[in-house]
Amino acid sequence: MIFGISEPVAFVCFFVYGSFFEWTLHKYLMHQPRWLYPFRAHALVHHGLFRTGEQYFLSDPKVIRKVRFAWWHAPFIILLHMPVIFWLQDMLALNILGGALSALILYYFLYEYLHYCMHIPKGRWLEKTFWFRWLDSHHHMHHKRHFNNLNVVLPIADIFFGTLIPAKEHLATPNREAGAQQVSLLLSAS
């Protein structure tokens, strides 16, 4: 096995794949009652606590942990992919392990961080970027229509599967600023 272009190509391929994995996980595990644990944790609890409008933002510091996945989800998702990565690496006779793992880890980190920033605004520099504001509006629309806009990081799968609906109204800056003030007060009081 040689290092060359295979690692960066694997990174790009697995990052794009991350969009499809996120979409599938979100649609078929987190929004389907037959999978009780993910359905309860996400569709019932998360969507019950974080709705639309001002309720899209954190309103009770005791539920801050309901924004993120459980600690064991990241290692589980990575381990789940290891057999496929090793199989592809062996089949292609190319070194893709580093690129594939880097893409999956970065995608997961971005999902967690972006999702956290969306529901717990603090006026971070990231929250002021066009890219974040577009993704935030995209996700806000998901909280209005639960079976659309299933991607948080990269909505390629939403486009591909026809579940993308454009945000008709963007979360206006005053709403995010008010949300950031509300979160700041809540967290400082706890």
Positions of PLM-derived features:
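Membrane-embedded catalytic scaffold of the fatty acid hydroxylase/desaturase
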Residues: 18-101, 105-179
